[in-house]
A protein has these predicted regions:
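Conserved N-terminal segment of class I S-adenosyl-L-methionine
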Residues: 1-102, 106, 110, 122, ...
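Short catalytic micro-motifs in class I SAM-dependent methyltransferases
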Residues: 111-115
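Helix-to-beta-strand junctions that scaffold the AdoMet/dcAdoMet cofactor pocket
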Residues: 117, 132-133
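Short amphipathic alpha-helices and their capping/turn segments at secondary-structure boundaries
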Residues: 98, 126-129
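Conserved aromatic-histidine-acidic binding/catalytic patches
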Residues: 11, 15, 65, 116, ...
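S-adenosyl-L-methionine-dependent methyltransferase catalytic module, highlighting the catalytic core
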Residues: 120-127, 137-262
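Activation segment
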Residues: 95, 116-117, 149
Length: 263
């Protein structure tokens, strides 16, 4: 088996562990998982976040435009002996369900919204709503834009650049020059600049949510992202008042913002 497959399996297992330890309890206060709800994940990758929901007996559907990830998701679920459906597509091109019964009780969008460029975020939310049952909930998780690695620069080939915090806050011209100087190829630079164009501070997210006529029923800001427990062996740490209430500045120390939205 290719090293890439082994690496993706590790990543799948890490996501499943975080989902099992944190996502399940976070959404279970609003969704009765014992009732086997229908769960949709947009931008599912290899499906690690969905695995614990499938273990609970939920029907799960994952959508992602990366065929390799969808193929891995199908393989990993089959290995686990669990049922999961996966679609390789741009979510915006997936037709909405034709009946209420085919819609979903819970929609997961984790580490996705910060990759959607600005003009398309409102359209994305409106399309998402068409997949939700009248009393459904949506979970969103994303890194606040100004946090140390909010630009995802950790994906850089250069070990030096990948460890530099806050460089995504440079001007686009300065950022491009820095990336070029340290050998990043044009594809990687384009990806990082797209993330810069798609920036998602929490205040802007809530503005889009309000415009979409969705209600925030729960929000949690993390200084130490729960996924860092399995990734870096760090203990997750929630922000506390008054740090959660400081506009703009909170984006600099919020490594992950979690929201539960309701129709």
């Amino acid at each position: 088996m290719q090293a890439r497959h082994l690496d993706r399996r590790v990543y799948f297992n890490e996501l499943a562990k975080t989902s099992r330890e944190y996502f399940i309890s976070y959404v279970n206060k609003f969704i009765d998982l014992e009732a086997h709800p229908r769960v949709l994940e947009i931008g599912c990758g290899e499906g690690g976040n969905l695995l614990p929901f499938a273990e609970q007996g939920c029907y799960v559907l994952g959508i992602d435009f990366d065929k390799n990830k969808i193929d891995s998701a199908n393989a990993f679920f089959e290995e686990q002996g669990l049922k999961g459906d996966f679609i390789c597509s741009d979510f915006m091109k997936v037709p909405e369900p034709q009946s209420v019964e085919e819609k979903y009780d819970l929609v997961l969008i984790h580490d996705v919204v910060e990759h959607i460029e600005m003009p398309y975020k409102p359209t994305f939310l409106e399309h998402m709503k068409r997949f939700m049952k009248p009393d459904a909930y949506a979970y969103f998780g994303f890194p606040a834009w100004q946090m140390p690695f909010g630009g995802h620069q950790q994906i850089c080939k250069s070990k030096f650049v990948s460890k530099l915090p806050f460089i995504h806050l440079l001007s686009e011209k300065q950022y491009r020059r820095l990336l070029q100087r340290h050998g990043e190829d044009e594809g990687k630079i384009a990806e990082l600049l797209s993330i810069k164009h798609s920036k998602m501070p929490v205040e802007l997210f809530e503005k889009f949510v309000k415009a979409a006529q969705l209600k925030v029923v729960k929000r949690t800001y993390w200084v130490i992202n729960p996924h860092y427990k399995v990734k870096f062996h760090l203990i997750p740490l929630r922000e506390i008042w008054p740090f959660t209430k400081i506009p703009y500045l909170r984006n600099f120390y919020t490594t992950s913002a979690w929201y539960i939205l309701h129709q």
